[in-house]
From Swiss-Prot:
Function: Tyrosine protein phosphatase which functions as a dosage-dependent inducer of mitotic progression. Directly dephosphorylates CDK1 and stimulates its kinase activity.
InterPro entries: MPI_Phosphatase (IPR000751), Rhodanese-like_dom (IPR001763), Rhodanese-like_dom_sf (IPR036873)
Transmembrane segments: none
Disordered: annotated span: 76-98, 285-335
GO terms, biological process: cell division; G2/M transition of mitotic cell cycle; positive regulation of G2/M transition of mitotic cell cycle; positive regulation of G2/MI transition of meiotic cell cycle
Boundaries of every Rhodanese domain copy: 401-508
Gene Ontology CC terms, in alphabetical order: cytoplasm; nucleus
Entry protein name: M-phase inducer phosphatase 1-A
Length: 550
């Protein structure tokens, strides 16, 4: 009877609160104590941890009238207002508290008659609101309603404290107090203990999804044991489904990312091409697809249209504006054109090569061309003649040009004795060549005719070319450049080995003895040793002569 009288005398609340069942029960106990109602519990009970915490809240600076040490948060002024808890009018009128054990905060209008239909509308999910839900967003403080004090004086009001937007953890009362005050029957004790177990299981994770729904039979039992407090659970369910702080704290861009559709990677390339090419690519979004096979040039393929400006020239004229002119049209001559001077860059490379070839066709003193036809051979710096040319020379076909010719056989004496070309001289040592040609140089009787020297060995590969170069070097050293005693020197291509099979009649004796003959091994070693010694002596003599000149 006392409970019904209190509930009828209280004014309806201006807005719903977010406190759970245990906090509501504690507030009801405080109201019963202040109204001096008869309750079957001893006033001398010891303070429980929850009661001690409530006493500590009452001694805060917000209840003593001092200015709280907290900056005013104006970030969520646009949110929906929530009622602020106040103390009882009786307690505010009296300047002191009666007893620390009975000092609790009173909430105006804990029950709302118009919320009964909400509990009937969704009875199954009313039980889910009993379990605590912890929101991860920053709590935003709500404004006071029209019946309360203005928000501008909120910090200077000592009897008020700020109600956070997030759901507070339920304040647990001791089991003995609950049994003695709220549940005189065994049924209520069992229900509250079951409720406490469910709440402790949910508190295992601070961030959790909606708890699993209970079956229908268990919901009916819980709704019967709520003793008329089902309205609070419907209010909690609505606030859990639509939390005002969680949506308010999200920015516009974050809300678009969470609610918008996922980007599709298969975007048409034509949409990407619409982007400006001049835009910087340094900060391109990673989600935007990029065309990998884009052309490197602006126009990789030249159009085939003949009327494009690419195929038309424009000639600038001082007397007339620009006029297009076809490429195939011949340009008009403007007066007398100056002749460009000849430079090395304008000379054709072929002309240079021809001049080089012309110089190579000249004899050693660059006065005349070679009298005999030459061919290319192994050594590019020497002039070669064939066996046919030598045979023609021996037959007198070049008597009009050649006054006298010398055939020098550079083979060893045993090779020369085994078979040689007619009228050939055997000079296999450098000293012999020097003594024969340079001590008393030979000159032609007629200036118009030539003096020719032809070298050869077995293959004309080593000994013949070496002797030819030696004579040219000694001749250069004995004369002033480019004068020479013997400007025309030749090599027989293929040597005696190729000449003998074709022209045996020009050889005497008509035989051929190779250098590595089995019968002349000792002679080969002896002549090689003499040649090496003579070469060493010659080098020493040259060094002495150079030192004497210094």
């Amino acid at each position: 009877m006392a409970e019904s009288h209190i509930m009828s005398s209280e004014a309806p609340p201006k807005s719903n609160t977010g406190l759970n069942i245990r906090t509501n029960c504690r507030m009801i106990l405080n109201l019963l104590r202040e109204k001096d109602c008869s309750v079957t519990f001893s006033p001398e009970q010891p303070l429980t941890p929850v009661t001690d915490l409530a006493v500590g809240f009452s001694n805060l600076s917000t209840f003593s009238g001092e200015t709280p040490k907290r900056c005013l948060d104006l970030s969520n002024l646009g949110d929906e207002t929530a009622p602020l808890p106040t103390e009882s009018p009786d307690r505010m009128s009296s300047g002191k508290l009666e007893s620390p054990k009975t000092q609790f905060v009173q909430f105006d209008g804990l029950f709302t008659p118009d919320l009964a239909w909400k509990a009937k509308k969704c009875p199954k999910r009313n039980m889910n609101s009993v379990l605590p839900h912890l929101l991860c967003s920053t709590p935003s403080f709500k404004k006071a309603s029209g019946g309360q004090r203005s928000l501008s004086n909120k910090e200077n009001e000592g009897e008020l404290f700020k109600n956070p937007n997030c759901k507070p953890v339920a304040l647990l009362l001791p089991q003995e107090v609950v049994d003695s005050q709220l549940s005189p029957t065994p049924e209520n004790k069992v229900d509250i203990s079951l409720e406490e177990d469910c709440e402790m299981n949910i508190l295992g994770s601070p961030i959790s999804a909606d708890p699993p729904c209970l079956d229908g039979a268990h919901d009916d039992i819980k709704m019967q044991n709520l003793d008329g407090f089902a309205d609070f659970f419907s209010v909690d369910e609505e606030e859990m489904e639509n939390p005002p702080g969680a949506v308010g704290n999200l920015s516009c861009s974050m809300a678009i990312l969470l609610s918008g559709p996922l980007l599709n990677q298969d975007v048409e390339i034509s949409n990407v091409n619409n982007i400006s090419l001049n835009r910087s690519r340094l900060y391109r979004s990673p989600s935007m697809p990029e065309k990998l096979d884009r052309p490197m040039l602006k126009r990789p393929v030249r159009p085939l249209d003949s009327e494009t400006p690419v195929r038309v020239k424009r000639r600038r004229s001082t007397s007339s504006p620009l006029q297009p002119e076809e490429e195939n049209c011949q340009p008009q001559r403007r007066g007398t054109s100056l002749k460009k001077t000849l430079s090395l860059c304008d000379v054709d490379i072929s002309t240079v090569l021809d001049e080089d070839c012309g110089h190579r066709q000249l004899i050693g003193d660059f006065s005349k061309v070679y009298a005999l036809p030459t061919v290319t051979g192994r050594h590019q710096d020497l002039r070669y003649i064939t066996g046919e040319t030598l045979a023609a020379l021996m037959h007198g076909d070049f008597n009009s040009l050649v006054e006298k010719f010398f055939i020098i056989d550079c083979r060893y004496p045993y090779e020369y004795d085994g078979g040689h070309i007619k009228s050939a001289f055997n000079l296999h040592r450098q000293e012999e060549v020097t003594d024969y040609f340079l001590q008393q140089p030979l000159t032609p009787l007629m200036v118009q005719k030539r003096l020719i020297i032809i070298f050869h060995c077995e293959f004309s590969s080593e000994r013949g070319p070496k002797m030819c170069r030696f004579l040219r070097e000694e001749d250069r050293a004995s004369n002033d450049y480019p004068s020479l005693y013997y400007p025309e020197l030749y090599l027989l291509k293929g040597g005696y080995k190729d000449f003998f099979p074709e022209y045996k009649e020009l050889c005497e004796p008509q035989s051929y003895c190779p250098m590595h003959h089995q019968d002349f091994r000792e002679d080969l070693l002896k002549f090689r040793t003499k040649c090496k010694t003579s070469v060493g002596d010659r080098k020493r003599r040259e060094q002495v002569a150079r030192l004497m000149k210094l």
